[in-house]
């Protein structure tokens, strides 16, 4: 998946800025 490549678990405001919180939510659940 390109998800990890484009939406890294950092505070970097990348192209997936809106997906960052969702990514963390998924990891923490």
Curated annotation (Swiss-Prot):
Protein name listed in UniProt: Kunitz-type serine protease inhibitor RsTIQ7
Organism: Rhipicephalus sanguineus (Brown dog tick)
Site (Reactive bond) residue list: 17-18
Domain BPTI/Kunitz inhibitor: 6-26
Protein task: Serine protease inhibitor. Inhibits trypsin, elastase, plasmin and kallikrein.
UniProt keyword annotations, A-Z: Disulfide bond, Protease inhibitor, Serine protease inhibitor
Keyword Iron belongs to the record: no
UniProt xrefs under InterPro entries: Kunitz_BPTI_sf
One MF annotation (Gene Ontology) recorded for this entry: serine-type endopeptidase inhibitor activity
Keyword Disulfide bond on entry: yes
């Amino acid at each position: 998946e390109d998800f990890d490549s484009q939406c890294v678990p950092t505070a970097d405001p990348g192209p997936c800025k809106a997906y960052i919180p969702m990514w963390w939510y998924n990891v923490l659940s």
